[in-house]
A protein has these predicted regions:
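N-terminal leader/targeting segments and the first structural element of proteins
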Residues: 1-3
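Histidine-centered nuclease catalytic patch
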Residues: 5-37
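Polybasic, low-complexity binding patches
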Residues: 32-37, 45-85
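Long, charge-rich low-complexity segments
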Residues: 86-93
Length: 93
């Protein structure tokens, strides 16, 4: 899929807004090359909850991230928000 064909966020699957960031499911530091489109708030949430090593161990699988309780909670909360919704990202304690 080309960057021009992107219509939904890789993490939350909501339609994308005017701002799109490109996330490496397997971090570049771990030799990941693929990128996927995400909302900025979704991108910050991923990196707030997972280290690069944890992301690399997941092998870029969305399913392994959404099983995480905090990510599942975030996805339920963000589901009804508009595509360009912005909110501060809370880091786990």
């Amino acid at each position: 899929m080309s960057h021009d064909e992107v219509r939904s966020c890789w993490l939350c699957e909501r339609p994308l807004g005017s701002k799109v960031q490109w996330h490496h499911p397997v971090p570049k530091a771990k030799r990941g090359r693929e990128t996927v489109p995400v909302h900025p708030v979704c991108h910050r949430t991923i990196h707030a909850h997972f280290t690069n090593a944890e992301l690399a161990r997941s092998s870029g699988a969305r399913e392994s991230l959404v099983k995480h309780s905090e990510i599942a909670r975030f996805l339920a909360w963000i589901a009804g928000k508009p595509p360009d919704f912005h909110a501060p990202t809370r880091r786990p304690r």
